Structures are given as structure tokens and as C-alpha cells.
Amino acid sequence: MLKHDSMQVSQDQPIYSEAPLQLLLFVDGRPKSKQQVQRIRAYLKDLQAEYNFELQIIDVGQQPYLAEHFKLVATPALIKIHPEPRQILAGSNIITQLKNLWPRWQAAADTYAKLQEDLQERVDDNGRVAQPQSTINSVAVSAELLRLSDEIFNLKQEKEKLLEQLQFKDRVIAMLVHDLRNPLTAAAIAIETLQSNYNPDIGQFQRLKPALVVNLLRQARTQAKTIDKMIADLLQVGRGTDTELIIIPQKTEIGLLCLEVLGELRDRYTTKAQKVETDIPQDLPCVYADPERIRQVLINLLDNAIKYTPEGGTISIAGLHRTTQKVQFSIGDTGPGIPSDNRERIFENHYRLERDEAKEGYGIGLSLCQRIIRAHYGQIWVDSNPHGGAWFHFTLPVYPS
């Protein structure tokens, strides 16, 4: 009798373990194999009129672990899993193979059935009657073990990624806490200087010129804003809410990465007869960053530099080990530069300078650059080139030694 047509092998479904002959038919959803599968199933249905056997049909798309378990390389495939030895029939002539093997399979199954009848009369040491093992059920268990093993492997990889992200955040928090000292010290010095020279009796500052008082107040205010921003960054890192971009940080040689990008853009700047000057120290430490994301930043900044630098102009690239925890990378051009009033807004999404409204401007892609650098808990900014043009700078965390 044909059993369990088009069902998945599962420990939860009924298993006809009393059937001495047990077969698995592996199929897939390809239209080309549909007719062949139908012919195989029809032939098996004819055989069941003469002999009782167990058949389960398995869709490899739904249960790939079973296909992996049996190391199948093609479907459809018919497998005799019981009685031993196991046999696999595959290819375009499965029915022909089955016709040749069927008498032997039937004889082996009959022999096994006779042995099982003899076992029914035996008892084990505990007085229990020995029972035949369900081979199909054991296959289901094997498939489940394969699936669980795969899941464990994936979970281990996820765990490693999460640990790396936690370690990255720990280093970033340590870096930001360390960097808080500079603006705190500068603000404290300015406030202490003002406090020590203020005479409350007359309501005036002594020994301080008005211009210096204004400058000290401005410095204290500027440093307070810097501290406020850094605290916001710390809170964001602690909450883990920076989900705008997914980065996979690793040890990255940013100098080498920049030279690779320059090689890709060589035709662009040589066509305009532009000169490229690099000042990247050989001992510049590696950064802890996502190389593909940083490549995007470098391509965007260098593309803009080439675009806005006139023919025969100069593009400058420099690397600087700014602190023990930061590397600064800078790209300069000799183009028209960025007006001071626009240097903050230039990183806004789709923002263009008035002069660039008729064409693609700096704002295209710079917002992405800012998002990428911020995702690395770095900073990006622009200032003027003394020789004309603009310098774009960004910082990245140093890879821990």
C-alpha cells in the first residue's frame, strides 16, 4: 500500500515502521522534472498493488537538510533506505533501474520481514519484546540534527558579530570619554580665567581687555557646544540606536585603500591633467572600519575633487595620526571652494550650492559620507584650502594593537 504521498519526513507524523521496504522519493519544483516525477509515482503505484511498502515524497526545497544528508546531486531521486544496504537511483532512467532492482529489493524485504517475525518471539534482558527500528524516523532525526547544526553555526557567527560590535562600541565610548577632556579643559580654563579676574564689587573684569573677555566667553560657549555634541554621541552609542547604516568593522589600511581608489579614478584626473599629491605616512596605523563603506567615502570625495579642480590643478591627499585613538584623513582640491556659510549645510541630504543648482553638486553623496563616518563614530568636516579650494577631513578610530 502506498503511504504518505507528498509529505515531509517529520518525527511528528505517523511512521509505518512495520513496512519492511521503505523508500524516499526526492522531488523539486522544476517544471522540466514534473512529467518524470509523475511517471515514477504512477509506476510505484502499480507496484503497490503487488507488494506493501512505505513511500514518502520529499520536496528538496522544503527540506534541504535531507538532500544534504543523502548527498544528493540531482533530482528526482529514489532512495531505498530499508532494508540495508541503502541504494540511490537517479537520472533520467529511474524507472528502468527500478525494474531491474525491484526483484532483489522485494527479496531483501521478505528476508527482513521473516527475521522480524523471529524477533517477535524473543525478549530482552528486561523482559520486553524487541521492536524493529523505524528507519524513516531515524532519517528524520538525522535531518533535524543537520538543521540544528546549521542553526548553531549561524548563531555562533551572529554571536561573534555582536561581540565585535560590543567591543567596537566599548572602544568608541572610551575614545569619546578621552576626547571629552580637551573641551572640558579648554572651557574650564576660560571660565577660571574670567572668574579669577572678575571683581564683583565693581562688576568688572580686572586686568582683562574687553576683547579678551569676549574671546574667552566665546571659547567657553564653543567648548560647551562641543561637549554637548559628544555627550549626545555617547548616549547614542550606549543606546545602540545608530541603525542608519550597518557596518562590519575590521582592520583596514586606509592608505592602501585610498591608493586603490586613486588607481580606479586615474583616467578621470589624467584626462584633466590634474596633479595628485599624497602625504600618507608609512607608519600610519590601521583603522577599525568597514573597508567597503570607507571606499564609498573616498570615491565620493575624490570624485568631487576631480570634478571641481580645474584642468592642471592639484588634488592633495594626506593622512595624520591625530591622537592615539584617531586617524585623520584629508582630501583637498584647488577648485572654487565652499563658502563658510555653507560648510555645515553642505552635508545635508540633496543640498546644493547656488552655483551648482543646474548640475550635480557637492551635496550629492556628501550626506551619505557623513552617515558612514558617523556610523564609525568619527567626524567629517570641510574647511578652506589656503591656496584656494576646499579640504574635506574625516576621522576614524585606530585599530587596537
Swiss-Prot record:
Enzymatic class: transferase
GO BP terms: circadian rhythm
InterPro entries: HATPase_C_sf (IPR036890), His_kinase_dom (IPR005467), HisK_dim/P_dom (IPR003661), HisK_dim/P_sf (IPR036097), KaiB_domain (IPR011649), Kinase_SasA (IPR023527), Sensor_HK_Regulatory (IPR050736), Sig_transdc_His_kin-like_C (IPR004358)
Domain Histidine kinase residue range list: 175-400
Sequence positions bearing Phosphohistidine: H178
GO molecular-function term, one example from the UniProt record: phosphorelay sensor kinase activity
Catalytic reaction list: ATP + protein L-histidine = ADP + protein N-phospho-L-histidine
Keyword field contains Transport: no
PROSITE patterns per record: HIS_KIN
Record remark on domains: The N-terminus interacts with KaiC, while the C-terminal histidine kinase domain autophosphorylates and is probably responsible for self-oligomerization. The N-terminal domain stimulates the C-terminus to autophosphorylate.
Role description: Member of the two-component regulatory system SasA/RpaA involved in genome-wide circadian gene expression. One of several clock output pathways. Participates in the Kai clock protein complex, the main circadian regulator in cyanobacteria, via its interaction with KaiC. KaiC enhances the autophosphorylation activity of SasA, which then transfers its phosphate group to RpaA to activate it. In addition to its output function, recruits fold-shifted KaiB (KaiB(fs)) to KaiC to cooperatively form the KaiB(6):KaiC(6) complex (independent of SasA kinase activity).
Subunit structure: Homooligomerizes. Interacts with KaiC. Participates in the KaiABC clock complex, whose core is composed of a KaiC homohexamer, 6 KaiB and up to 6 KaiA dimers. SasA and KaiB(fs) compete to bind to KaiC.
NCBIfam families: PRK09303.1
Name recorded for this polypeptide: Adaptive-response sensory kinase SasA
